[in-house]
Every structure is written in structure tokens, then in C-alpha cells.
Amino acid sequence: MTAFKRVLIAMISALLAGTTGMFVSAGAAHAGLDNELSLVDGQDRTLTVQQWDTFLNGVFPLDRNRLTREWFHSGRAKYIVAGPGADEFEGTLELGYQIGFPWSLGVGINFSYTTPNILIDDGDITAPPFGLNSVITPNLFPGVSISADLGNGPGIQEVATFSVDVSGPAGGVAVSNAHGTVTGAAGGVLLRPFARLIASTGDSVTTYGEPWNMN
């Protein structure tokens, strides 16, 4: 083997190793706890809301329109209540985005999901009164979608994409590949995902994640 071939093989091996490491690092950066925030409410309970494993996969828009941004959202939101009366806690857990756009003429957002993609996390169905060892979750309905007009830009708008009723001292919700689009936006679009816990008493706490660029 000539010296030139040995050098060429060494360069290709180094390039492949660096590329593989880059892909592994990018995937690991979004695993685990992303962000959290706590609040002591009016009843001296500590309300904590968290975002886990957040990943927004921006894809080329199917309509091939330069003013459309399309993505799929996966992740989990969890809440913890500690203090007096935590077992009797009732409220709502919301997920959504802050959407920033530099210029637009009538921006619209669409977001949709199918019920098997929304899972109640940390729920125990093996104990009474359920006593179930396994569960199959068919679609409760074909899907749910929201549409909103964000108006003319530039601007920052906040949209709650879905919410679930929760009770007890802890719980969560998981979403996998929920579909979202923004139309009518010129330039880059930034999405900042959030999770919000709202108690039945009106107290609320919101945690915001890092912005995701949907160029």
C-alpha cells in the first residue's frame, strides 16, 4: 500500500469518527430533564413543573411553500406537588409554544395529534379499583387539532397546544410526533416550548425551554 493510500484511509476514518460523534452528541443533548420551575402557592404547597426529553424535528414542508414551517414534537411534561393537601391536588397541565417571527402577513399556526400519542405518565392501573395488568389504548377519537391566527409580524405569540386534567401529588403527560405547522412567516421562526401547571385554585407555574430554530 502506498503512502498516499495510507494517508487517504486515515483521513476518511477520522472524518467518519468525527461525524459519528457529532450525531451522538446531538441526540444526547435533548435527553433527560430539560428545565423546571417551582412555586409556593397560596396553600403553602410547592408546585413544580418540568419538561423532559424535548425534541422538535423540523422537516421540509409538504406544501413546498417558503413561508411554511413544519415540525414534529416529542417530549414529556411532569408535575410534582409537595406540602399540605398534596394528595387532594387538582388542576390542569398545559403544553405549548412561544412563537417568534420577524416578519409576516397573517401568520397562522396549526397543531394536531392523535390520542395514542398522548399518554398519562406515572399512572398506576394495577391497584384497585382498576386491577388491570395491561391496557390497550385505541383512539378515543381520530385526533385533535388547533388553529390560531397570530396576526402580522414581527412579534411573539404564545399558544397552548393541548392540556389535560390532572389530580394527585404527581403525574405527567407524554407526546410523540405531534404535528405542527406555521404558515405565512417570512424569515426564521423560533419556537420556545413550555409546560404549565394550573391549580384549581388559580395558582400557576410555567417552565420555558430553549428556543428551537425552524428555518
From Swiss-Prot:
Q: Which residues form a coiled coil?
A: none
**Superkingdom field:** Bacteria
User: Transmembrane among the record's keywords?
Assistant: yes
Q: Which GO terms describe its biological process?
A: monoatomic ion transport
Covalent S-S links between cysteines:
none
What Pfam families has UniProt attached to this entry?
Answer: MspA
Keywords in alphabetical order, please: Cell outer membrane, Cell wall, Ion transport, Membrane, Porin, Secreted, Signal, Transmembrane, Transmembrane beta strand, Transport
Record-stated family: Belongs to the mycobacterial porin (TC 1.B.24) family.
Q: What does this protein do?
A: A backup porin induced when MspA, the major porin, is deleted. Probably forms a water-filled channel which favors the permeation of cations. There are about 2400 porins in wild-type, 800 in an mspA deletion and 150 in a double mspA-mspC deletion. A triple mspA-mspC-mspD deletion mutant has low but detectable channel activity. Different conductance values with maxima at 2.3 and 4.6 nanosiemens might be caused by a simultaneous reconstitution of MspB channels into the membrane or by the existence of different MspB conformations.
Record protein name field: Porin MspB
Species of origin reads Mycolicibacterium smegmatis (strain ATCC 700084 / mc(2)155)
Report the gene name.
mspB
